[in-house]
A protein has these predicted regions:
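Membrane-embedded, lumen/periplasm-facing catalytic core of multi-pass transferases
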Residues: 397-462
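Extracytoplasmic loop-helix module adjacent to an early transmembrane segment
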Residues: 34-85, 95-100
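Transmembrane-helix signature of polytopic, membrane-embedded enzymes
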Residues: 107, 124-148, 166-167
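Signature aromatic-anchored transmembrane alpha helix within multi-pass, membrane-resident enzymes
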Residues: 24, 28, 192, 212-213, ...
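Transmembrane-helix motifs of polytopic, lipid-linked glycan transferases
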Residues: 111-132, 171, 326-327
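Hydrophobic/aromatic-rich transmembrane helices and adjacent perimembrane loops
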Residues: 162, 168, 200, 206, ...
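Membrane-interface helix-loop-helix junctions at transmembrane boundaries of multi-pass membrane enzymes
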Residues: 130-132, 136, 183-184, 219-233, ...
């Protein structure tokens, strides 16, 4: 009996010794699989990224970096330029620069996504190691991350700054962690590092300030030490510089999500607190995304909103964080204080933004980076627990998230293979093959290109236009009232307006055509293009 128990113990030890190797193999295999599949099939693109690329391709004619050209609403024959304040520059600048090396945009996107995914994996490994977690815990966490939907999403659906922030954020956090003595020279790398975060994604400003503030107060008995005051002064100077630079060089120069008004949620602060805490728990596993898939899928919608899922997840999040704090408070106290202070600061900023009725969405992706900070602690607390109930609960939730992540990648890849390939080498999810082919027949080079305006129902479709001027809206998502409120004045020699066929019956197509107020409504010629149609008027 003793020999049997001893053998079992040695077998368990051997299994633990193999965990890092097995997880490393899974990380490498899946990352390569995502990259190869993305390079072969090519990704599609979300509209936010599409807007950025629309601006990127007009910058050669603009007066300065990050300015884009679009039609003058008072006279569409003219162009006006505007600072692109809504979208982070990194999401289109980096793939755009890679494209200039000679490859098409679709492949350039995969190169950038793969590079920042690998950079992020190395960064999170280094950061988790700096926190003092053992290799088995680190590799389990990384294997789970790679299996998740958020990690593989941009290999099929390019989401811009999310991948970039995943790649650079851990290195910034590691730098702050290494410099948490807060010598005066630390201000410069803190500010420069935050600038890199902002280049990757605008919310990097929030993360940078929160991480610096959290590191200033995470020391043992920090509240009882005078040195904490010095650290807070250094942190305050760094954060003030970050904020001032961001405010004057970016925020005041145009519209951002934090400056667009919207309506408050009916439940107010109760919902916002529940959502924020839930996202800090769910974002590392894409669990709210899973909730959307299960309960809000347009083809089989079960719930009217995600609210019920948020309220159901909230107690699970609180319980998870409580268990993590109790189990790690003795051996990882500084890590816990740093992470909870950082997450608390980020949560407060988002609560203030939501309560101010600003149009920051309710997506869990906004909390991905702080959630990944918490995730390594959660993994260690649960997989090292003596309680089989805790280990089983962890395995069940993580297993479900990983299954969803990998299968959703396969599903999205298959779906992409059926979308038409665009001229720039990425898949067009919202355009028909007939529409893409027709654009190529009307997008002619030469002196008449500047006298042609092609208006499209989503910005990523506008990237099919290489010569003529182009513009777009979000016809499928804009309300009918908003479309009716638009007015484009003036005339141009050739005007083409593309809309989805389904908009012909709900009044949106008519509203878009009537928004060109100097064109007679009975003067349009319609060309059917599969599930899309094109209306045009050409001046003789």
């Amino acid at each position: 009996m003793v020999r049997s128990l001893g053998g079992a113990g040695r077998g368990s030890d051997r299994l633990k010794a193999w965990v890092p190797t097995l997880c490393l193999g899974l990380v490498v295999v899946l990352t390569l699989a995502y990259t190869i599949a993305g390079a072969i099939v090519r990704p599609n693109m979300y509209s936010d990224s599409g807007w950025g690329f629309v601006g990127w391709y007009t910058q050669a004619r603009a007066s300065a970096f990050n300015y884009s050209l679009g039609p003058d609403l008072s006279d569409i024959s003219r162009e006006v330029e505007a600072f692109m304040s809504t979208w982070t520059p990194g999401q289109h600048v980096l793939p755009g620069l890679v494209e200039k090396l000679g490859m098409n945009l679709g492949l350039a996107i995969i190169v950038v996504v793969a590079a920042f995914s690998v950079l992020g994996l190395f960064g999170w490994h280094a950061l988790y190691q700096a926190f003092g977690f053992p290799p088995p815990t680190i590799w389990v966490a990384l294997a789970v991350i790679v299996c998740n939907r958020f990690f593989n999403l941009s290999f099929t659906n390019y989401s811009g700054g999310e991948s970039l922030l995943f790649g650079v954020a851990p290195w910034f956090i590691l730098m702050v962690w290494r410099l948490r003595e807060f010598r005066w020279f630390s201000v410069i790398p803190f500010v420069l590092g935050t600038a890199v975060l902002v280049f990757a994604k605008l919310s990097g400003m929030i993360f940078g300030a929160a991480v610096v503030g959290g590191a200033a107060i995470c020391g043992d008995r920090a509240w009882a030490k005078w040195d904490t005051l010095r650290k807070l002064v250094v942190a305050g100077i760094a954060i003030a510089l970050m904020g001032a630079i961001f405010y004057f060089t970016w925020y005041t120069r145009g519209v951002t999500a934090a400056s667009i008004p919207t309506t408050l949620h009916p439940d107010g602060l109760l919902f916002y607190v529940s959502l924020g805490v839930t996202c800090l728990w769910s974002a590392s596993l894409s669990l709210l995304d899973l909730g959307h898939y299960l309960f809000l899928n347009p083809g089989r919608q079960v719930l009217k909103s995600i609210d019920a899922v948020v309220y159901a997840f909230f107690p699970l999040a609180v319980a998870t964080f409580t268990v993590t704090w109790i189990r790690l408070r003795h051996d990882y106290g500084e890590y816990l204080r740093f992470v909870f202070a950082t997450c608390g600061a980020i949560l407060v900023v988002f609560l203030a933004t939501w309560m101010a009725a600003k149009s920051v969405s309710f997506d869990e992706r906004h909390f991905r980076i702080p959630a990944l900070l918490l995730f390594i602690g959660v993994v260690h607390a649960f997989i090292t627990s003596q309680s089989w109930i805790l280990r089983l609960c962890f395995a069940a939730v993580v297993g479900l998230a990983c299954l969803y992540g990998v299968t959703s990648f396969v599903t999205r890849t298959i779906a992409n293979s059926h979308y038409p390939m665009g001229d720039r080498g990425f898949r067009q999810m919202n355009a028909t093959a007939e529409a893409i082919a027709y654009i190529r027949t009307i997008d002619l080079a030469g002196p008449d290109a500047r006298k042609t305006l092609i208006f499209l129902p989503s910005p990523e479709i506008a990237l099919e236009v290489r010569n003529a001027r182009n513009w777009s809206n979000l016809a499928d998502f804009d309300s009918l009232e908003d479309l009716k409120a638009m007015a484009y004045r003036g005339r141009i020699d050739r005007l083409y307006v593309f809309v989805q066929k389904k908009l012909l019956g709900n009044g949106k197509a008519d509203a878009i055509l009537r928004s060109f107020v100097d064109y007679p409504i009975d003067g349009w010629t319609m060309v059917p293009l599969g599930d899309m149609v094109c209306f045009y008027q050409i001046r003789n």
